[in-house]
């Protein structure tokens, strides 16, 4: 079902139209809140399985349904950016693109490039994802950072940038806004621990990553990610 807040608004929506409906709601939210600080979290269903895309994108795609779903996200992004510019708040809005995991198998449309593994695994192909942050006039266009971070760090980092106040209860994120600016590469995170459900599968310290277990079987594999990002 399609749910808004706690209300079911449609039991069996046409999933090919979901991107357009999400985008319409996002634009309406921005319009109604443009004169005040706002937070918008937009998590498209594309390109998650099963793949559904509007017919107009399928007809234009050179990479099947997967390419059509990517095109629908591109379209949605352009609509939202146009709205921010139309309202005059484009340069006062931080936009973050990120993913919660790596791609599936390549024969399902996605690709993790040289990274080993896929979604659901603790190899870099399942864990390392791009993050693009846009803030016109504040974050230099084309700047890059390979400092290690996680989506848990967004809350304290953005809170600092907007001069907000964090909740008093303990949070897991670390303030990482230094990585947003001027090709900064120094991360405040030295240690990463990788679990697959209840199994501790890998530990990373700085550039070194030790794999301990995969699919219930113990292994001992150590990689220098600075020189071997593909864990070969």
Label for each model-derived stretch:
Residues 40-50, 97-103, 172, 194-198:
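Short, solvent-exposed turn/loop segments enriched in Gly/Ser/Thr/Pro and often Arg
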Residues 1-12, 105, 191, 212:
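Catalytic-site neighborhoods of secreted/periplasmic enzymes
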Residues 50-52, 59-65, 69, 82-138, ...:
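Histidine-centered active-site microenvironments of extracellular/periplasmic hydrolases
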Residues 6-8, 24-69, 104, 112-113, ...:
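Active-site His/acidic residue clusters
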Residues 13-21, 64-71, 145-149, 170:
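Soluble non-cytosolic domains of exported or imported proteins
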Residues 33-40, 89-95, 128-129, 187-189, ...:
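Loop/turn elements at helix/coil->beta-strand transitions in domains of secreted/extracellular proteins
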Residues 103-113, 117-124, 138-143, 147, ...:
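C-terminal cap/loop subdomain of S1 sulfatases and analogous C-terminal strand-loop tails that border
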Residues 37-43, 70-73, 77, 94-99, ...:
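Beta-strand elements within well-structured catalytic alpha/beta cores of enzymes
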